[in-house]
Amino acid sequence: MLHFTAATSRFRLGRERANSVRSDGGWGVLQPVSATFNPPLRGWQRRALVQYLGTQPRDFLAVATPGSGKTSFALRIAAELLRYHTVEQVTVVVPTEHLKVQWAHAAAAHGLSLDPKFANSNPQTSPEYHGVMVTYAQVASHPTLHRVRTEARKTLVVFDEIHHGGDAKTWGDAIREAFGDATRRLALTGTPFRSDDSPIPFVSYQPDADGVLRSQADHTYGYAEALADGVVRPVVFLAYSGQARWRDSAGEEYEARLGEPLSAEQTARAWRTALDPEGEWMPAVITAADRRLRQLRAHVPDAGGMIIASDRTTARAYARLLTTMTAEEPTVVLSDDPGSSARITEFAQGTGRWLVAVRMVSEGVDVPRLSVGVYATNASTPLFFAQAIGRFVRSRRPGETASIFVPSVPNLLQLASALEVQRNHVLGRPHRESAHDPLDGDPATRTQTERGGAERGFTALGADAELDQVIFDGSSFGTATPTGSDEEADYLGIPGLLDAEQMRALLHRRQDEQLRKRAQLQKGATQPATSGASASVHGQLRDLRRELHTLVSIAHHRTGKPHGWIHDELRRRCGGPPIAAATRAQIKARIDALRQLNSERS
């Protein structure tokens, strides 16, 4: 605190001498900012503020994990700069229209008045405001207007989620034109990376050891640090797999299991089949998620859940499922519908159980009571995933946890396991996974694509669901178990108030109990579970696959090898196609081989 006071004192003395007289510039009288509006700062915010006031940079990039308080940090900076006349007005640039209102409300707690209704068509604003709220799209549509405003008075420009500044060349050019002459620029992001090579405006890039340019932050506060400080919640991922069946345009029928090593096309179609609201997978997962939410609400009565859908059609279908299954109509938010912002605010302040949204709520929107999520979208870039999960991590009290239900798809499981990994934006990456980023463009204006062209000729035939594994703190727990089973109930019934260490210990105990029961069943079994009600070929294949996946899970926990690696090794040893195309004899051979391997390691 001593360092904070010293830095602030140096800052005040210099600014009071330098700014004893100023001109209004025809834009109205600068409103005073009261020193009584100083909400308490978290540790990282205080350290970053000391760094900022001590160095007085023109450009500053703060990277802080979603939910850690970037907004409050920026508003405190703005209040300090206004109070000592370093700047005379503030412009905050955000991705969506809803965030304009959200920021304006937050600013009031810091003694600041920001105009959320400022429009390009009518650029006048009341002199009672300290500044204005605008979107990236709004700036891009008329950069000259915003350049004139910025040049007329000493301006602090705050960029919320600055990675959007690289969404298009025209956007980047517009932002540079509008705010190139700003007195101060403060950039914020929880995800300082993109899926393309578009440079982010006003962000510094430095070459790494390989000569590749990487973005450089002035202050970084990651998820792991925030978790240790109790600023964010621990996140538990419940990954659901299952057999998916579909028909292509030629009439050929296919079957595959989510989570198996599959081609990109097979993975996409199995994933799409699972997310079909008319199938069996989504109702089963929604049932499990609602059960988990009810468990949390026993300790946190206003805890809420959110389903993130791919498009408007499925969002409405999921809402109908929720209404039928829970006897409570959820809040539905579609960014192209009038009143969507008001519905988000109403849900955030209420106690309703479920919200269904199409991407709009996945970034920046503050709904602290969200504790359970269903990731029912096919978006899989690190940027979108990180922003989506960020909606659930904001901590309100010690011990709160977040539970996210995801399809057991390899790239999602990898992202879930690497939640604590720090990423930077890299320019010129040699092998980029995809040039398409689902967050490209302004989320407020982006079209929420309906299912169509790519899915014509594709027919989902159904998918069952089973809990494949639980991921926490980068580790996998549990083995595959059907929905509705006692083993699934053990994981869904985890207490709602646990810190990270308690959660880790409990998951280890649940896993040990599950593996012990499975081992006892294996010792007592004399025949594979392929008789009785499973006399059909389809039933036998289903049971054999389930048995194999259970053994693969056991091998995974014993060896630390990924599920996919174990499947590939079995194919190398035993031969044959991927499991979805394997015969009963081929699957039995893999089961025998894996049992032998497991017994050798026992």
From Swiss-Prot:
Residue spans of biased composition, Polar residues class? 523-534
Q: Name one GO cellular component term.
A: cytosol
* Basic and acidic residues composition-biased segments: 430-439
UniProt GO molecular function: ATP binding; DNA binding; hydrolase activity
Q: Which residues form the Helicase ATP-binding domain?
A: 51-210
The record's region (Disordered) falls at 430-452, 518-538
Q: Which residues form a coiled coil?
A: none
Reading the lineage from the top rank, the first entry is Bacteria
**Which family, according to UniProt?**
To M.leprae ML1624.
The name this protein carries in UniProt is: Uncharacterized protein MT2985
What is the organism of origin for this protein?
A: Mycobacterium tuberculosis (strain CDC 1551 / Oshkosh)
